[in-house]
Structure formats: structure tokens, C-alpha cells
């Protein structure tokens, strides 16, 4: 291996730190059944459905306070990985541990520790106000009465949405909906924040504002942990301290951004080299 290539060396599922991980993804495989077409049901009704493997034998450790960018092409398995960590999906094989608890055996407990910010506008009730939406979702987290009202006011102010609290959600811009989605997660005060391509539908100004919001929110508590799926290397550099590359259902590499900076390697260069190495396997 040449000196140049050594700089780009890929270390699959690199484990950083020796303390017990907050999140452990252990030999996880996730398969989804492929729906049969009508003709297949008629001609071969007893034939088993084919399956699609979204993630294969994945291993990853996340320490408390890590801020990790999960990068990869569309369909690589990024969202599947994040949903498995959040407990929204259960693995076909292997296990996911959050705070030492299995997402399969103790799903309710682990989901309380993780807040997932969906990049999906339909996840809100459009004919309710922002505050009414937060009241509904807060009640699902067993918050009620004065405690819930105070928490709603606090998170709305935190995300800069206090003036829009009584406006119907369907009147919100994409950026406002993303801020409301972050507020919804903040209500429950999770240990882990997961964001799935949070700036995908935003214009450049709204992107910068959202990045600043995420940074200020995370930095209010340095022990909070962040995982964010993104296609934007500059976003990964600004928000995160580590980058994990996913491709074709596999975790291909993991590297500290500090290490990359020390070697004069950008996140984009590292990502490209990992993907090139993958194609050469």
C-alpha cells in the first residue's frame, strides 16, 4: 500500500474509545419481503416471496457524546440503519443495544432514549397548530398538564418557533416544519438525536439556519449524542465529529473527522476513496 493510500485506509466499523458504548449494532442484517405482483399470486401462489437485504452483517459502536454523520448513496441502507438504532425497525438477524438494552426485548425502554427526527412532512397533523401537534405528541411521551405546557413553550423558544405556535402546520414552510420536528423530539429529552437528511428539502439559507439550530441544541448538553444521515460533506464537517460510510447494505468505513483534518483529507475525499475501494473489492 502506498503512502497516499494509507491516508485513506478504510477501517470497517471502527470502534473509537474503550468505554462501554451507548449504542452497539452487532452483526445486524435487515431483510424486507418484496411484495408479489398479481400475476405471481395467481401463477405461483405457494411460492415464497423474494426478500431484499437492506443491511448485511453491520457492526457499529457509538459512544456517549459522539456526533456521527452517516453517508452513502441512495438505497445504501442509511435510513434502515438509523431506524434500527431508533427501534422503529427490528433486525432480522443480530441485535441492537441502546444503553445495554436490546431494541428487540426492551423496545419501549430503548425508544424512550432515542429521538428520531423524520424528514417527512406528513408526520404532522396539518389542520392543527404547531403547539397542538406538540401537545399531542408530548402526551404520547406521558407528559401532561402544566409540565407539558411548560415543556412546549421551552422547546418552541429553543427552535425559534414561539411566534408561529398558533399557526396551522399546513401554512408552515419546509424549514419551519423541520424546526417543529426537532421541537417534537426535544420534548421527551432523549439521550440520542437521529436526523434523516434534515436539510434535503431546504433552500441554502434555511439549510444554514437549521445547521446552526442543531449545533446550538446539541452543544447545550455536550453529552448528547447525534447521528445524522446526509449527502452533504460540508454538513457532515459542520455537525459531526465522525463519519460512517454505508454502501450496498454494508458499513464500509468509519473515521474521526479530526483524524482526516490532521492528514489534510476532506470528508468528500474520504467518502470517495471508501466508495472506490468498495467497487474494487
Regions found by a protein language model. Name each.
Residues 71-73:
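The feature captures the beta-strand-to-loop junction immediately N-terminal to the Walker
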Residues 86:
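Helix-to-loop junction immediately C-terminal to a conserved catalytic motif
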Residues 94-104, 110:
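Conserved ABC transporter NBD signature motif
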Residues 135, 139, 146-164:
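Conserved ABC ATPase "signature" region
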Residues 193-197:
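Catalytic Walker B motif of ABC-type/P-loop ATPase nucleotide-binding domains
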Residues 208-221:
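Helical segment within the ABC ATPase nucleotide-binding domain
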Amino acid at each position: 500500500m502506498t503512502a497516499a493510500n494509507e491516508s485513506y485506509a478504510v477501517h470497517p466499523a471502527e470502534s473509537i474509545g474503550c468505554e462501554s458504548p451507548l449504542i452497539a449494532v452487532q452483526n445486524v442484517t435487515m431483510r424486507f419481503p418484496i411484495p408479489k405482483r398479481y400475476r405471481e399470486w395467481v401463477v405461483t401462489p405457494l411460492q415464497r416471496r423474494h426478500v431484499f437485504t437492506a443491511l448485511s452483517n453491520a457492526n457499529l459502536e457509538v459512544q456517549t457524546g459522539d456526533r456521527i454523520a452517516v453517508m452513502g448513496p441512495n438505497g445504501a441502507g442509511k435510513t434502515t440503519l438509523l431506524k434500527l438504532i431508533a427501534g422503529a425497525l427490528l433486525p432480522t438477524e443480530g441485535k441492537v443495544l441502546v444503553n445495554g438494552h436490546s431494541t428487540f426485548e426492551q423496545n419501549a425502554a430503548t425508544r424512550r432514549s432515542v429521538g428520531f427526527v423524520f424528514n417527512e412532512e406528513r408526520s404532522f397533523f396539518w389542520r392543527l397548530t404547531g403547539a397542538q401537534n406538540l401537545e399531542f405528541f408530548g402526551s404520547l411521551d406521558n407528559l401532561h398538564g402544566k409540565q407539558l405546557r411548560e415543556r412546549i413553550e421551552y422547546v418552541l423558544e429553543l427552535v425559534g418557533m414561539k411566534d408561529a405556535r398558533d399557526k396551522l402546520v399546513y401554512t408552515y414552510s419546509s424549514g419551519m416544519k423541520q424546526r417543529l420536528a426537532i421541537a417534537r423530539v426535544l420534548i421527551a429529552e432523549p439521550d440520542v438525536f437521529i436526523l434523516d437528511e434534515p436539510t434535503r428539502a431546504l433552500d441554502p439559507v434555511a439549510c444554514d439556519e437549521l445547521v446552526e439550530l442543531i449545533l446550538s441544541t446539541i452543544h447545550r448538553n455536550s453529552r448528547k449524542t447525534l447521528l445524522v444521515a446526509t449527502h452533504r460533506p460540508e454538513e457532515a464537517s459542520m455537525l459531526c465529529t465522525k463519519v460512517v460510510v454505508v454502501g450496498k447494505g454494508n458499513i464500509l468505513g468509519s473515521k474521526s473527522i479530526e483524524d482526516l483534518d490532521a492528514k489534510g483529507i476532506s470528508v468528500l475525499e474520504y467518502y470517495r476513496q471508501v466508495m472506490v475501494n468498495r467497487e474494487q473489492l
